[in-house]
């Protein structure tokens, strides 16, 4: 699994930060969280393949989070895309996509499936054998949702028990791995007889734009979140501005991360007012005095975060 931060800015882009967009690569598939203006150009500087984007998750319909969609849709059409593209977002997302497709001359020959998500209740919006995706309602100036991507880990085979029961590599072992009972020498063997509990999988939360919500932190804790990407539009001294605009400060984001039980928090959606990050770094240092175990990172454009927890400069 690898995260690529395509854009880490806020409402107004800067020389150093593009509008919000984050790619999550998992099992050869790309999941895109928000798609701000210039996203497709940012992708050029990474190893993200636009043709492998199957799902786009929109947190809310402010322009800085969605204005990259028209260009991306057209570009992947030019590249010959035929497989469906799924777009998830809060209420009015379908209307927005319809308006996009009705402006200009688009030749899009692949299916676009739009799924509107409630901004009032949490939902499991995707469920597969390998991963689940959840939405959670957050509080912003327009309907908004956060997302959680959770890897599904299957039970591991206990080779000692397998050997003890005399199960050989073959159809019986495969059936047990797939969750079915088998009969061996007149005895029924269940998957539970030969498996160990699954290891903890990777679970990534993305806040979108929001005020700090303890309810969101508790939801993340329930899902055993390991990495939280949380907006931190302002530093601690701008708390009044954060409250007025329904955003979060660095301290807000760090407190939510600590409450959620996440190992790592990555701060993003940095206001254009910050040419440098000394105020952010000061807030992080102060917080870590009392919470040294929390791994804190401030995202930068075109930075990657790998499964092994390492930053990679593109």
Swiss-Prot record:
It is an enzyme of class 3 (hydrolase). It comes from the Archaea. Its cofactor is Zn(2+). Its EC number is 3.1.26.11. It catalyses: Endonucleolytic cleavage of RNA, removing extra 3' nucleotides from tRNA precursor, generating 3' termini of tRNAs. A 3'-hydroxy group is left at the tRNA terminus and a 5'-phosphoryl group is left at the trailer molecule. Transmembrane segments: none annotated. Zn(2+) 1 binds at residues 60, 62, 140, 209. Gene3D superfamilies: Ribonuclease Z/Hydroxyacylglutathione hydrolase-like. Binds 2 Zn(2+) ions. This is Ribonuclease Z. It comes from Methanococcus maripaludis (strain C5 / ATCC BAA-1333). The gene is rnz.
């Amino acid at each position: 699994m690898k995260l690529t931060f395509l854009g880490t800015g806020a409402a107004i882009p800067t020389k150093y930060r593009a509008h919000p967009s984050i790619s999550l690569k998992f099992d050869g598939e790309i999941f895109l969280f928000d798609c701000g203006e210039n996203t497709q150009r940012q992708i050029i500087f990474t190893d993200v393949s636009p043709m492998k984007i199957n799902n786009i998750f929109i947190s809310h319909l402010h322009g800085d989070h969605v204005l990259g969609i028209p260009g991306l849709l057209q570009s992947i059409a030019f590249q010959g895309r035929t497989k469906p593209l799924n777009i998830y977002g809060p209420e009015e997302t379908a209307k927005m996509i319809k308006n996009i497709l009705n402006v200009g001359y688009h030749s899009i020959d692949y299916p676009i499936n739009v799924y509107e998500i409630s901004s009032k209740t949490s939902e499991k919006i995707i469920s597969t054998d390998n991963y689940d995706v959840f939405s959670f309602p957050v509080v912003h100036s327009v309907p908004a949702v956060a997302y959680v991507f959770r890897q599904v880990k299957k039970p591991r085979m206990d080779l000692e028990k397998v050997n003890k029961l005399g199960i050989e590599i073959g159809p019986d072992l495969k059936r047990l791995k797939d969750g079915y009972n088998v009969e061996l020498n007149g005895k029924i063997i269940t998957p539970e007889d030969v498996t160990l509990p699954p290891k903890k999988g990777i679970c990534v939360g993305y806040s979108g734009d929001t005020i700090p919500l303890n309810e969101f932190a508790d939801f993340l804790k329930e899902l055993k979140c390991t990495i939280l990407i949380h907006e931190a539009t302002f530093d601690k001294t701008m708390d009044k501005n954060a409250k007025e605009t329904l955003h979060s400060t660095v301290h807000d984001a760090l407190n939510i991360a600590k409450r959620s039980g996440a190992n790592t928090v990555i701060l993003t959606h940095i206001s254009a007012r910050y040419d440098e990050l000394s105020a952010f770094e000061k807030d992080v240092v102060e917080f870590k005095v009392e919470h040294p175990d929390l791994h804190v990172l401030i995202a930068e454009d075109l930075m990657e975060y790998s499964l092994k927890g390492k930053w990679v400069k593109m």
